[in-house]
Amino acid sequence: MIGRTHMNGRVTESLIGQEVQLKGWVQKRRDLGGLIFIDLRDRTGIVQVVVRPENEAVHQLAETIRSEYVLDVKGTVLERENKNPNMPTGNIEVIASEINILNAAKMTPIPIGDEAENVSEDLRLKYRYLDLRRPALQETFRLRSKTSNTIRNFLTEQEFLEVETPILTKSTPEGARDYLVPSRVHGGEFYALPQSPQLFKQLLMVAGFDRYFQIARCFRDEDLRADRQPEFTQVDIETSFMDIEDLMAMMESMMGQVMESTLGRTDTPAKFERMTHAEAMRRFGSDKPDTRFGLELIDVADAVKGAGFKVFDAALESNGQVKAINVKGEADNFSRKDIDKLQEFTAVYGAKGLAWLKVTAEGLNGPIAKFFDETYAQKLIEATNAEAGDLLLFVASKPTVVADSLGALRVKLGHELGLIDESKFNFLWVTDFPLVTFEEEDGRFYANHHPFTMPNREDLHLLETDPASVRAVAYDLVLNGYELGGGSQRIYERDIQERMFKLLGFTQEEAVEQFGFLLEAFEYGTPPHAGIALGLDRLVMILAGRSNLRDTIAFPKTASASCLLTQAPSPVADAQLEELSIRTAIKEKK
């Protein structure tokens, strides 16, 4: 038997009485009163195949079939007596007339089903080709494919050109560490894998392409976490002559189409909420706030200043902050031990302590309540909009520590207390980022986005004298507390780009050596241009309701940037290294 008439998940009541030919894997086999039932699975779903004892040859063969065998089945579609409302094909079954075993299978080291979620991730990644057979993961990749196609079709309709940019590029100091590729032809020299197509897409604007996009593979050698991978995919977009407002409106329209095509959601707002970077940090302690719930940070400096609690006073005297979050109605649900665990959590973000108070009908209760007389207690209650039964949590430190620790605590409590409506998709634009940040350890400024972001022209006069106050013409798209992507207007004038390089610590010679091709391009009539890059893996993760980026990538790396399936990275032969003019110097492990 060759060929296939239908995919398994698409065998419906409309085919009753017809002969079909199906292919797939055995999800399970059951023997019941002489009848053999086989659940046959392909990527569209499962259909029940019935083998009757009167078909003796097929019945004998079916007795030898085990889970994950690959079958070719021919049979007639009939209505099921005992319907299964939990299956799309639950109203029908296929009475087998012929079965051919295309391939047998050993017992799999991991289950092919939801129960695989209880198996260690390392084992699932080692046998990723089996893990990917799971219907839940296959559904995620169907969603990913639909997302990519929707984006590609939308941008094509908007007259964007899809252009591929080089994978072997020049190493430039613009962000994380590069992955390097040695050149055999040019011994001792290296290519870098692109962290993004940033420079090439800007050069395409110089070339007059006007509107460009690419679903691009990118590589960053950085410390990993649940929502990061060393190789990832981004939707890369660049436009010339387009107003920032128009670009943002276009992205809003595109995301609306993605939500409708993938999840059937038609409630995505035509315009997304906007918030400045300063407001996001002030209210949520994060530049990518999850706005699906409250627990906002409250500045209580005016309410606690002078009360006599030395920790608060010392922070304020050293230009620090005292902020609180009001956990409404939870005072009785948090023991001292519970709060100690929260304190351990905030310590990871640099907080030296987590002060707390419980609000009662009589006033304030807790280890620092003695510092707040009736007047100060009332001021604090009013500042935090507190009522009896509320739990107040405080951090006093420098602004970055207050934001990081309370911002993270806010999200932790939001999840643990069930405050987040998981059915919501809250899109948000965060704007007016600072152009640069000063790192005290290095004693230098770093670009918050990248060195090619245009400073706000209103602030250009501050670039040399007060760079920390310069705003960038930059915008991040945030969804449910994740940064979906970042964009900006680009620098397109050589003198501004050179000033930016100088601010970031480049000498004139270093700037020309690293980016001379870009600086020269700016002298040949470069148009104003802007763009954005959206993380496709992260977008799919959110749409699929997943919490791990690895679930959205077919063959992902582990947290240590290794592939358990292929054992990459791995040593190579000395002859290969010699051909590449490379000698390794591995330090002995102590």
Swiss-Prot record:
It is found in: Cytoplasm. Belongs to the class-II aminoacyl-tRNA synthetase family. Type 1 subfamily. GO terms for cellular component: cytoplasm. Residues 198-201 are annotated as: Aspartate. Keywords: Aminoacyl-tRNA synthetase, ATP-binding, Cytoplasm, Ligase, Nucleotide-binding, Protein biosynthesis. It catalyses: tRNA(Asp) + L-aspartate + ATP = L-aspartyl-tRNA(Asp) + AMP + diphosphate. ATP binds at residues 220-222, 229, 483, 535-538. It is an enzyme of class 6 (ligase). The lineage of its organism: Bacteria, Bacillati, Bacillota, Bacilli, Bacillales. SUPFAM superfamilies: Class II aaRS and biotin synthetases, GAD domain-like, Nucleic acid-binding proteins. Pfam families: GAD, tRNA-synt_2, tRNA_anti-codon. Catalyzes the attachment of L-aspartate to tRNA(Asp) in a two-step reaction: L-aspartate is first activated by ATP to form Asp-AMP and then transferred to the acceptor end of tRNA(Asp). L-aspartate binds at residues 174, 220, 449, 490. Gene3D superfamilies: Bira Bifunctional Protein, Domain 2, GAD-like domain, Nucleic acid-binding proteins. Its EC number is 6.1.1.12. GO terms for molecular function: aspartate-tRNA ligase activity; ATP binding; catalytic activity, acting on a protein; nucleic acid binding; transferase activity. This is Aspartate--tRNA ligase. GO terms for biological process: aspartyl-tRNA aminoacylation. It comes from the Bacteria. InterPro entries: Aa-tRNA-synt_II (IPR004364), aa-tRNA-synth_II (IPR006195), aa-tRNA-synth_II/BPL/LPL (IPR045864), Asp-tRNA-ligase_1 (IPR004524), Asp-tRNA-ligase_1_N (IPR047089), Asp/Asn-tRNA-synth_IIb (IPR002312), AspRS_core (IPR047090), GAD-like_sf (IPR004115). The keyword ATP-binding applies.
